[in-house]
Amino acid sequence: DYIPTRKGYDFTGWYSDQALTQRITELRMIGNRTVYAGWIKSNPDAGANPFTDVYGNDRFYKDVMFVYEKGLMSGISATTFAPNTNITRAQIAVIFYRMAGSPAVEGKNHFTDVEYGPGTVGVYDAVTWAQQNGIMGDSDGKKFGPDDPVTREQLASIFYRYAQLRGHDTTQDGMAAGSDLPDLKGTVTRAETAEMLHQFVEKQGLKPVAASTGATEWRKPTS
């Protein structure tokens, strides 16, 4: 696909209108048609955006860049964040495990659908930690449901339980938005998760510090 360049600006996509309100997600020119290129000024202080599906004028752009640059979330590939894809239970477990500093995990979990082996150790440890600390439980008997989506209501509860575990503010002022949305049973996308995570970190005043494991732990600064 052709991506234009302009010095000092970032390309945000193709649009069908001059006001740049109707973005074209698929462009196939079969006749005379006018399209418009969207641009925003580059921020020389910001890290490079590796994702081809996250644009500078997206509402969630700053949230995605924050969680990516801080190591709280990664893409589903080196160049794809999949902002509109539902977040999964396994991905949520990994996020909160990372935020806690990826602590050492002892013992095993009882889930029959979370395997320990090459390429799955990180997820296994995250799920085991989430279960042992009461952050997340089973979804169906002895199954964790790692690929199952997460609802807004469930994610709000996970944020609350995590805040309790870590001694953070559990009042409405300290929690991420989400529990006050009308569709609590609706599933949460990866972009919405990034937004809620960014809000939570800022509302709680959390800062990255080096954990004993060598990972980064997010906690309130000590005076």
Each PLM stretch: what is its role?
Residues 40-59, 74-124, 132-190, 199-223:
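Feature responds to low-complexity, polar/acidic, surface-exposed segments characteristic
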Residues 68-69, 127, 131-132:
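Alpha-helix C-terminal capping/helix-coil junction sites
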Residues 1-65, 70:
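Secondary-structure capping and domain/repeat boundary segments
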